[in-house]
């Protein structure tokens, strides 16, 4: 029997400051957004592995001491990132055109305390976004968009070198439909995403490595309908085919781990508009997940699962506390036990058990 464990302590600060406004140039209206964001993150990680004596599954004897437990990793990761971004959303007649850009400056360091080594990486990058949409008289709005992405990581490879940031590009085409005089919205989209330098590892004790490229292709469908002033129904479905496009020969063309092939959800909510319970919101929904592969060679497919969630919210404005609201979220209401994902045939992970989260917010 094997054992692996890890610990992490993280401190972080993040700031995002933005300014938006509107200006006209002739017949074109410009909705402008400009901003600066900053994050400074530091985390300390430790990793252990070990071995325990065998156990008889039919006549188990508990309480055995480990043969050994070894500290194999003790690292400090630091990441500092500053981003400057600008977006112009233009409106002319029935056309909508969006252009955006972002410039990032990133500094990353990985300090290996076990081997007394350090690796640093400094990068600058420009990301872009463009989208085009046309509004027809009948409520149909086709659109096309393209964007690039840049995500730094503080993970290091087997030689202690910080991995290159993940880069990606996405094409998306779709159509939105809002029936005239109705209270419903429908959308359908197809997309393709290509990502490079994806950080991954097979076993918990393995070092990280970069996958050359992963390609995702999929379809997304969504429907939102206000059945009445109080009742709202939302349903969605996503089909995704994610494969290793540039990787090791064994993985080439295989489906990626962690990625469901099919996901579907439905959510029904009810708002109390009058009476003693005015301001109360009740909601419940289901999530279905199917087609997660067991490993990078696609040996097996994990069993599908369905989860039930619930929410109770209360807008305290109805009792004179303007802007104040409280909410209780329950995820995995039935406390279903299921396998959510696998790194390999040797390491799989159960999904999150029932969780109950309460929150209070104040808008002013």
Please identify what each model-predicted range represents:
Residues 1, 45-74, 119, 200-201, ...:
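Surface-exposed loop/turn segments flanking beta-strands in extracellular/periplasmic regions
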Residues 9-13, 78-82, 122-126, 167-171, ...:
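Residues that define the transmembrane beta-barrel architecture of outer-membrane proteins
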Residues 10, 25-33, 37-40, 75-195, ...:
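Structural signature of Gram-negative outer-membrane beta-barrels, strongest in the C-terminal barrel
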Residues 15-21, 84-90, 130-134, 173-177, ...:
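Residues on the lipid-exposed face of transmembrane beta-strands in outer-membrane beta-barrel proteins
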Residues 20, 24-28, 92-95, 135-139, ...:
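Outer-membrane beta-barrel channels and translocator barrels
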Residues 31-32, 171, 257-364:
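Conserved C-terminal beta-signal and adjacent last beta-strands/turns
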Residues 44-51, 109-117, 153-161, 197-206, ...:
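Outer-membrane beta-barrel translocator domains and adjoining extracellular loop/strand segments
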Residues 94, 192, 210-295:
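Gram-negative outer-membrane beta-barrel transporters
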């Amino acid at each position: 029997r094997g054992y692996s464990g890890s610990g992490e302590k993280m401190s972080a600060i993040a700031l995002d400051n933005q300014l938006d406004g509107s200006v006209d140039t002739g017949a074109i209206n410009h909705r402008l957004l400009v901003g600066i964001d900053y994050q400074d993150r530091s985390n300390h990680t430790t990793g252990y592995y070990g071995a325990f004596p065998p156990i008889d599954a039919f006549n188990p004897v508990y309480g055995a001491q480990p043969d050994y437990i070894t500290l194999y990793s003790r690292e400090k990761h630091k990441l500092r990132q500053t981003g400057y971004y600008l977006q112009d959303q233009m409106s002319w007649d029935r056309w909508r055109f969006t252009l955006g850009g972002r410039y990032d400056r990133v500094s990353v360091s990985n300090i290996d305390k076990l081997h007394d080594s350090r690796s640093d990486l400094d990068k600058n990058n420009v990301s872009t976004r463009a989208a085009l949409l046309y509004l027809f008289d009948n409520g149909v709005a086709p659109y096309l968009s393209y964007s690039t992405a840049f995500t730094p990581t503080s993970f290091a490879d087997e030689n202690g070198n910080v991995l290159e940031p993940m880069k990606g590009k996405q094409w998306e085409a779709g159509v939105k439909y809002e029936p005239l005089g109705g209270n419903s919205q429908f959308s359908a989209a197809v997309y393709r995403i290509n990502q490079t330098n994806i950080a991954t590892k097979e076993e918990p004790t393995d070092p990280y490595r970069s996958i050359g490229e992963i390609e995702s292709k999929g379809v997304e469908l969504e429907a939102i309908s206000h059945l009445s002033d109080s009742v709202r129904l939302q349903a969605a479905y996503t089909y995704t085919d994610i494969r290793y496009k540039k990787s090791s020969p064994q993985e080439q063309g295989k489906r990626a781990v962690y990625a469901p092939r099919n996901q579907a959800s439905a959510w029904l909510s009810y708002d109390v508009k009058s009476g003693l319970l005015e301001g109360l919101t009740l909601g419940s929904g289901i999530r279905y997940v199917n087609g997660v592969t067991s490993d990078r060679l696609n040996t097996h497919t994990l069993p599908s699962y369905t989860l039930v969630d619930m929410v109770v919210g209360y807008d305290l404005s109805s009792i004179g506390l303007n802007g104040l609201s409280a909410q209780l979220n329950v995820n995995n209401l039935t406390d279903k036990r299921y396998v959510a994902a696998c790194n390999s045939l040797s390491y799989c992970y159960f999904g999150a058990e029932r969780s109950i989260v309460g929150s209070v917010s104040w808008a002013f």
